[in-house]
Curated annotation (Swiss-Prot):
Subunit organization: Component of a DREAM-like complex which modulates a variety of developmentally regulated genes and of the mitotic genes in proliferating and differentiated cells.
DNA-binding region listed in the record: 98-121, 150-173, 201-224
Motif (Nuclear localization signal): 86-93
Task performed by this protein: Transcription factor that binds 5'-AACGG-3' motifs in gene promoters. Transcription repressor that regulates organ growth. Binds to the promoters of G2/M-specific genes and to E2F target genes to prevent their expression in post-mitotic cells and to restrict the time window of their expression in proliferating cells.
Domain HTH myb-type: 70-121, 122-177, 178-228
Bias (Basic and acidic residues): 529-548
Name of the protein this chain belongs to: Transcription factor MYB3R-5
One GO term of the biological process aspect: negative regulation of DNA-templated transcription
Single Gene Ontology MF annotation: sequence-specific DNA binding
Keyword field: DNA-binding, Nucleus, Repeat, Repressor, Transcription, Transcription regulation
Subcellular location: Nucleus
Residues covered by region (Disordered): 60-80, 256-288, 512-548
Amino acid sequence: MSSSSNPPVCSPEKEERSEMKIEIQCMENKQPLAASCSSASEGSGCFFLKSPEIATPATVSSFPRRTSGPMRRAKGGWTPEEDETLRRAVEKYKGKRWKKIAEFFPERTEVQCLHRWQKVLNPELVKGPWTQEEDDKIVELVKKYGPAKWSVIAKSLPGRIGKQCRERWHNHLNPGIRKDAWTVEEESALMNSHRMYGNKWAEIAKVLPGRTDNAIKNHWNSSLKKKLEFYLATGNLPPPASKFIVLKDIADGDRDSKQSSATKPFKDSDSLTQTSSGNTDSNEVGRDHFDSSSALLEEVAASRRIGVNEYACSPVEYKPQLPNLEPISEEVRINSKAYFERSIQRKVENGFGTPKHGNLYYKSPLDYYFPSEADLQHMYGYECGCSPGAASPVSLMTTPCNKDSGLTATRSPESFLREAARTFPNTPSIFRKRRKVVLAAKTDAVVVVNGVVKEVDRKEESKDMRKSLLLETTDNCSDDEELGLNGNAFNLSPPYRLRAKRTAVIKSRQLEFTSEKEKQPDNEIEFTSAKEKQPDNEIKTSEEDKPV
């Protein structure tokens, strides 16, 4: 076979015949039909064609070896300098005398040089994508010659070699190839085979009929390699649809819990396990955990709704932090509570009520109860002999809310009082026009009480002035008015209205509902009107004219 065994006197014709035998042997492509040869690198030949006597050591390679991937049949790769030298040698010998060509490469055989030229460096080699005509031609020739004789088949495809035709058939055109989705059984078999064979995809392909070594390699690197940790920990692969089933069951249970009532939650909770398949123990644990957590959340939400509705639909049992707050007498507190009980009874009859208390309901103390100003005017307007007009329906109650209404924002007692003051009907003109009043000088002031003009010194203590004015004003009320604990009349206005009341008394006009106004003589009324029409400088008394 080799010319090295011939004596030096051998003829050139005999040497050429021996080289032609090597070329014919390689061109007939007598490798096994298994696809294992398709995984070899382009610059390496098949293992039984390599000369072991002159094999290149692994340390001579100029490129670092791969730590993973298919096992190389040939050691070492071709450098760009070697490729250029091979081109010049093939051009010199016209691609025929491969023994002479191999002499340019001390560590390469003639077979390696031939394969490198035919599979990689030949400019006539077509490396582009396959056309439909080429695929049809391969299928037709395979029916004629069978899946063999790839060198003969390649002659009908210009620019293609037998190796390309073989790989195209086994990886794409073979009708026995499975192209559907991978099943769990196939992935488990691939896991077990990979533990035994590693990256030998041709050996793994024997375990998976219908899957090519190329498809097995792509599926392992792209998808299955990420599931390796779970497989090594449990021994099983996670089912693809189990996660969707569990999430669907939880969503269905959440929807059922929203539709169920507070007294009978989760009446359809048994349907959670009817749609789940596989891993029943884990589903049971997840269902129990979901039921308990959802029930707790629903109870907390119901208690919150009850707490807010109680605050909005019931009398405000809150102790406001107001300055100078005087204690309310026992009789006032009892009467005001009776009034609110009647109001609540009317609202319950109209269809509004308070829902039942939940477990998280907080009941504030009932001893500290403060009615609003509008309620006190409604309760004591007739007792003082005054005519308040229409009774104010406004109280410390918010707008009656229905049980089915949503959650409303909480409001402070100050906002209730402010709204009651704005919506109170028949507001006295004193409160509406108090900003137009021109006060007297800082030293003195003219006060008209019951038609009598009085000069009041501003320097005297405010406590004595407030007490005297309060006593004179309460004379207008009926004799059966009830006094407070200290003998003084009970002030119906809140503490922050005390200044407005004092300003109203200083004014030169009387309340419209004063019952004693009709009893005044005509001359006193005229005198009062004249005082009102005078300018401010005439009404005020200068400090110089003041009698000593």
